[in-house]
């Protein structure tokens, strides 16, 4: 399909976020690890996300994405992509933006780290 682009590495963050924001859909193929920064960036850019189905992606996205388990399943998703975008884009992207604001703000993360360090300092020292 001429609308599918494999653009390679893009290291200009502003350009990358612009591409994400104006994309029709974003495939997130990471299958291992924890919270992936590129997934959070795609969520913050308002992307409609199609993600590899694994515990890490589901922990971040919840029900706010479409999931595929194999290359064949991903290809099948493309057959119905127009209907999926029409049905779910506004809902999924809106909820993903809420998750980003609520769970991944620098203020929240800094506060959580501060509380953890305070707790650590209050623990009895042994040895």
Predicted regions and their residues:
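A charged, aromatic-enriched C-terminal amphipathic alpha-helix characteristic of glycosyltransferases
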Residues: 86-125
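Nucleotide-activated donor-binding/catalytic signature segment of Leloir-type glycosyltransferases, i.e.
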Residues: 1-13
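Short hydrophobic beta-strand element within catalytic cores of glycosyltransferases
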Residues: 44, 48-51
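Short acidic active-site motifs
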Residues: 14-15, 73
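Short glycine/serine-rich donor-binding loops of glycosyltransferases
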Residues: 36-39
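Short alpha-helix at the nucleotide-sugar/activated-sugar donor binding site of glycosyltransferases
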Residues: 42-44, 58
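Acidic donor-binding loop of glycosyltransferase active sites
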Residues: 18-34, 47
């Amino acid at each position: 399909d001429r609308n599918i682009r494999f653009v390679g590495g893009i290291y200009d963050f502003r350009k990358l976020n612009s591409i994400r924001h104006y994309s029709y859909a974003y495939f997130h193929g990471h299958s291992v690890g924890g919270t992936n920064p590129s997934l959070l960036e795609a969520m913050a850019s308002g992307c409609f996300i199609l993600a590899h189905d694994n515990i890490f992606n589901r922990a971040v996205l919840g029900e706010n994405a479409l999931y595929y388990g194999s290359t064949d399943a991903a290809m099948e998703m493309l057959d119905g992509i127009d209907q999926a975008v029409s049905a779910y884009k506004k809902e999924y992207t809106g909820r993903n933006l809420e998750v980003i604001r609520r769970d991944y703000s620098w203020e929240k993360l800094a506060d959580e780290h501060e509380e953890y360090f305070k707790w650590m300092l209050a623990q009895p020292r042994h040895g």
